Design a protein with these regions (language model features):
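Gram-negative (and chloroplast) outer-membrane scaffold detector with strong preference
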Residues: 51-55, 61, 107-198, 265-273
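Bacterial N-terminal signal peptides
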Residues: 14-28
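N-terminal secretory signal peptides that target proteins for export/translocation
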Residues: 1-13
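Short glycine/proline- and aromatic-enriched beta-strand/turn motifs that initiate or cap beta-hairpins
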Residues: 33-107, 191, 270-272
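Extracellular/periplasm-exposed beta-strand and loop segments of Gram-negative cell-envelope proteins
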Residues: 75-96, 121-151, 187-216, 244-262
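Generic early N-terminus positional signal peaking at residue ~5-7
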Residues: 5-7, 26, 39
Length: 273
């Protein structure tokens, strides 16, 4: 009798061959998977370059700095031309207060003392009109400008050092360092009034410009703090009071010296190197 192709013996042979093939593929694939596993893990691990952070210290004590600051100037506005301006015109106390900017470059003399050269600038512009006079039904208007630019030499003393040396080559900045300072000023100013005015003799109205400008010797004292931001950059906050006075020019005859005193409150940044 012919052999049937579907007999149990042949089926067992085919099944055994299939099982053997599956086992063989499993053995071959397993080493490849095992070998590829660590490679994936290694790819996800950070490299030394990714872990690098720039050190927050300097490799030497910084001896030079440049700085810029801005803030508010409250001028004293006492006496003389300021009193007359407030008496005749619609100008109030505090109208000559203004923003102020200052640039500095300095050099460390020692761990506790700096010497710097500074230039500041401020300008107030105040529109006004006469309090007691009209031109018909119209106000008599004018403008007063008061500009100042002190050029200063300043010595700054740190109450605690701005940083410390670690070993021979690393300088670590202090988080916060307070200081006091003082210096002398060559104080430039310009006081200008332009527009329409009333002649006190015959009460006639005329247009003109009156100006006084020049230099005055002065001085200042200050106190502040320096806070480390990043590496070579520091934030500074300072309060400063300055003194100065000088005679007015010939456009303003019979007045006492113009008062240049004022309080500055500023914030800024300094870059050390």
């Amino acid at each position: 009798m012919p052999l049937s192709l579907t007999c149990p013996f042949v089926s067992r042979i085919a099944l055994s061959s299939s099982v053997a093939m599956v086992l063989t593929l499993t053995v071959l694939v397993s080493p490849v998977s095992a070998a590829s596993g660590p490679s994936v893990e290694q790819a996800t691990q950070p490299t030394g370059a990714q872990d690098f952070r720039e050190p927050d210290f300097l490799f030497s004590w910084p001896r030079t700095y440049v700085g810029v600051a801005g803030g508010w100037l409250a001028t004293s506005q006492r006496g003389g031309i300021f009193d007359l301006t407030r008496d005749l015109l619609t100008v109030e106390d505090g109208d000559f207060n203004s923003g102020v900017a200052r640039f500095a470059i300095g050099r460390a003399l020692s761990r506790r003392f700096d010497l710097s050269a500074e230039v500041g600038f401020s300008r107030a512009t105040v529109p006004s009109e006469y309090l007691d006079f009209l031109e018909g039904d119209l106000p008599i208007t004018q403008t007063t400008e008061f500009a100042q630019a002190p050029v200063s030499a300043t010595v700054r003393m740190w109450l605690v050092p701005r940083g410390r040396m670690v070993g021979r080559f690393a300088w670590v900045p202090a988080a916060v360092a307070p200081y006091i300072s003082g210096g002398v000023d060559a104080h430039w100013y310009r006081f200008t009034q332009f527009g329409d005015f009333v002649d006190v003799v015959d009460l006639s109205i005329f247009s003109d410009t009156f100006e006084s400008s020049g230099w005055a010797a002065g001085a200042h004292v200050a106190g502040g703090i320096s806070a480390h931001l990043i590496k070579q950059l520091f934030l500074t906050v300072e309060a400063r009071y300055g003194w100065g006075a000088t005679p007015l020019s010939n456009d303003f005859v019979g007045f006492e010296d113009i008062d240049l005193d004022g309080l500055q409150v500023t914030g800024g940044v300094e870059f050390v190197f």
